[in-house]
Amino acid sequence: MFANYSPFYDRAGIAIYHADCLAVLPFFPSESIDCVITDPPYLVNYRGRWDAKLQAIAGDGESSWVQPAFAEIYRVLKENAFCISFYGWPHADIFVGTWKSIGFRPVSHLAFIRRQWGLGRYSRSRHETAFLLAKGHPPLPKQAIADVIEWDGEPEKFHPNQKPLDSIYPLLKCFVPESGVVLDPFMGSGSTLRAAKDFGLRAVGIEIEENYCRIAVNRLAQDILFS
């Protein structure tokens, strides 16, 4: 899809690059992406001790990548467009400070409520959060999205931070223009790309772990949900 870098997968408007996003994004043309939906490492040094199938998350132990990665994300995103990024609340200051410093404007905050409770020392987590970030002044959506979205767990989990497709669908519907291109530079197991395929959108994913690239390809091979 982009010159000088061979995709791991490229079919029917969906491309996957097996690489660090900082190695691939410089090859993307400026202002070539209509919307970014991503779930980057939370900087909490995650270890999946409770499930041997789920690996540690690359880049989760340090923050040096945050500024250069989001600077590239900002560059490739079109003017007057949105980036929706999940983040880890223990280091919200790093994420929010970085986003503002490179030009993003936080315009809304979204909470995703799980039916199942997580673990915790002081409180048991039941939600995850994302910022809606604007580059420039995007047009208002035809119908504003609710800032609290409930989700069920996925029937099969491939990644420790995997987001259900039902959490991605309303974001695509509200913030991605028709026939737009969606970017997920921290693709994981490919939920953003799978959801984009269901909506008939073009999408690009970047993932540093080859195993997750293969999982995403397998998920893309399944029948589309909508027709």
Language model feature labels by segment:
Residues 1-214:
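Core catalytic lobe of class I
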Residues 204, 213-227:
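C-terminal helical cap(s) of enzyme catalytic domains, especially alpha/beta-barrels
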